[in-house]
Amino acid sequence: MKYSALLFTLFATLNTSAWAVDLTKVHQGDVLPVMLAELKPTQPSVGYDQIYYKLGRYQQDAEKQFDEICEANGQKGVSHFDAQSQPAIATSFECKEPVGAERKDMKTVVIAPNSQLYLTDGHHTFNTFWHMEGGGSEFPVNVLVDKDYRELKTMDAFWKQLDLDKNTWLFDASDQPISYQQLPTTLGMENFADDPYRSLMYFARDVSWDKPAQPVPFLEFYWAKQLKPQLPLAPFDLNTEQGYLNAIEAASKLILAEQSNDIGGSGLSAKAMGQFDHFDAKKFKKLSKQNSKLSYMLGYKTAQQ
């Protein structure tokens, strides 16, 4: 039986409010239902163009939208939806697996000494859910509790340990160090700086690099940090397809030529960070086709200007 939108919203509100008040029964490895507004960021910037791609894609491809909602909830993908299905109403569509079945696909949080939930993976996905039609601050998601830091006495100690665990990115979009007090306090793109190099890494994926089996957290940011001194973006018009393709090609050539054993300060080599042996011309050409990632992104981006 399908719940009405009002009933589901009431259920989600009660459910997540309960978690916000009492986390005593929650442990590392648990799957936790929350609203997006309950999640605190651990990075100051995102790649706007990656989010624009998703938003543009969802506007024209409802199956992709529901598929990624299911995936984020650890449910593999969507198995059924119809014209009446609504993103925030889980009973209005069906996923392939129960919640939490595919935990490797879920976004992760940690519990801080102040009993707040800090998002350590999924800033792009959840900002997309925040801004998409049918999304918003009260959009319900399930997250995986990666670590519990409540035994630490202070928030200063928490952030120090989070940094040691490489579960936070304390650099601004110009790669200048920041304090944790300078981080956004909530999701929503307007609270994040735009890092165009982070977007370039997203679109160059499968062309010159791919995520290794066990990627280091913030892998794309490390690569972006490595590229910035070598690749000024002023010569590229990132509002046009050709300009963006030129930038992706230039970034990919630098990635393929990179021989550093410390990409962006990660302590890892280019190969360990997913560097390809050669330029994938077929995947690059795909970016210029109709209904490509670039076409969806540029269409949405242009409409916002």
Question: Where do the protein language model's features map onto the residues?
Answer:
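Surface-exposed, charge/polar-rich loops and edge strands
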Residues: 22-100, 104-109, 113-116, 124, ...
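Active-site-adjacent beta-strand anchor residues
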Residues: 119
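Gram-negative bacterial Sec-dependent N-terminal signal peptides
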Residues: 1-19
